[in-house]
Curated annotation (Swiss-Prot):
Residues the entry annotates as binding substrate: R129, M303
Stated consequence of mutating P219A: No effect on catalytic activity. No effect on affinity for D-Ala and L-Ala
The gene coding this protein: alr
Species lineage: Bacteria, Pseudomonadati, Pseudomonadota, Gammaproteobacteria, Enterobacterales
Protein function: Catalyzes the interconversion of L-alanine and D-alanine. Provides the D-alanine required for cell wall biosynthesis.
EC number(s) stated in the UniProt entry for this protein: 5.1.1.1
Residues modified to N6-(pyridoxal phosphate)lysine: K34
GO cellular component: a single term: cytosol
UniProt organism field: Escherichia coli (strain K12)
The protein, known as: Alanine racemase, biosynthetic
Enzyme type, top EC level: isomerase
Catalytic residues (positions): K34 (proton acceptor), Y255 (proton acceptor)
Pfam family, one: Ala_racemase_C
Oligomer status and interactors: Homodimer.
N6-carboxylysine sites (modified residues): K122
Reported cofactor(s): pyridoxal 5'-phosphate
Length: 359
């Protein structure tokens, strides 16, 4: 009997990379594998994508794990380096790094390195989180071009704040700032992540950085799914029924008795709970698949168990398979029901959930 297990479909992952190449045919791909590849497994994901042009991570530790695991492709530190003492390692491992503040620039100017570092200057075009402000950008860029520790030419990167809102006007403003600054500069350019790839073809430039869409999940909050863009879900969160019980009309279920059956029925108990990372906020009615059939969660999600209403005529039995999201049940639907973003759902699964990779 299988308890909580994430099944990762390598074939779907490779399909998605190819699909994104079709959407951005003139651009190279930075496959973003930060946060344990969005919960899909850092090394296994990178090894499944030998055709990716580079990989993107948020921490130096993630980059070092890739190198230790045999990944030789370029690795981009999307947030840059946090300590000047990391620069020799970045240089020796040939990592690319974002540079977005004065402290990082000064560290590069003062460092003693055997080889120069490939730099992506981060321009704040409107996200207002990381990056050099436009009015300071030319001077900052000039210093990078004069720095002996920076491999030339300097590349330029930015990030959209509202790419998933095509009618708000913010993305056009960011693109205008980005284009103005990049004009006449020889380096590579990148601004499009998942939303930009899907909705803003004029933003694709030299490199795109697919994140959540690489894993078959839509970055948009408009009830779309990855399938709407030709992508396939890579992760399926699965488990099993550990009990099937007769349940009488009028009886409550679970902590607090928040759900009361209106009929005699059969209840299934699933080996899954918030201790595995499934959202405790999932209300009664949230769908799961039992033997490929959609049934509703009833009562509160507990630490280790979820109850589902199988229906009065159900023939399901203990040990039968359950899918909480994934193939046949998009995680975007669970996000909509629980008001927990799909990004959070797939990245917060706990260490007791087993990982299984299939082709």
């Amino acid at each position: 009997m299988q308890a909580a297990t994430v099944v990762i479909n390598r074939r779907a992952l490779r399909h998605n990379l190819q699909r994104l190449r079709e959407l951005a045919p003139a651009s190279k791909m930075v496959a973003v594998v930060k946060a344990n590849a969005y919960g899909h497994g850092l090394l296994e994901t990178a090894r499944t994508l030998p055709d990716a042009d580079a990989f993107g991570v948020a921490r130096l530790e993630e980059a070092l794990r890739l190198r230790a695991g045999g990944i030789t492709k370029p690795v981009l530190l999307l947030e840059g380096f946090f300590d000047a003492r990391d620069l020799p390692t970045i240089s020796a491992q040939h990592f690319h790094t974002a540079v977005h503040n004065e402290e990082q620039l000064a560290a590069l100017e003062e460092a003693s390195l055997d080889e120069p570092v490939t730099v992506w200057m981060k321009l704040d075009t409107g996200m207002h989180r990381l990056g050099v402000r436009p009015e300071q950008a030319e001077a900052f860029y000039h210093r990078l071009t004069q720095c002996k520790n920076v491999r030339q030419p300097v590349n330029i990167v930015s990030h959209f704040a509202r790419a998933d809102e095509p009618k708000c006007g913010a993305t056009e403003k960011q693109l205008a700032i980005f284009n103005t600054f990049c004009e006449g500069k020889p380096g590579q350019r990148s601004i499009a992540a998942s939303g930009g790839i899907l909705l803003w073809p004029q933003s694709h430039f030299d490199w795109v950085r697919p994140g959540i869409i690489l894993y078959g999940v839509s970055p948009l909050e408009d009830r779309s799914t990855g399938a709407d863009f030709g992508c396939q879900p890579v992760m399926s969160l699965t488990s099993s029924l550990i009990a099937v019980r007769e349940h009488k009309a009028g009886e409550p279920v679970g902590y607090g008795g928040t759900w009361v059956s209106e009929r005699d029925t059969r209840l299934g108990v699933v080996a899954m709970g918030y201790g595995d990372g499934y959202p405790r906020a999932a209300p009664s009615g949230t769908p799961v698949l039992v033997n490929g059939r959609e049934v509703p969660i009833v009562g509160r999600v507990a630490m280790d168990m979820i109850c589902v209403d199988l229906g009065p005529q159900a023939q399901d039995k203990a040990g039968d398979p359950v899918i909480l999201w994934g193939e046949g049940l998009p995680v975007e639907r669970i996000a909509e029901m629980t008001k927990v973003s799909a990004y959070e759902l797939i990245t917060r699964l706990t260490s007791r959930v087993a990982m299984k990779y299939v082709d």
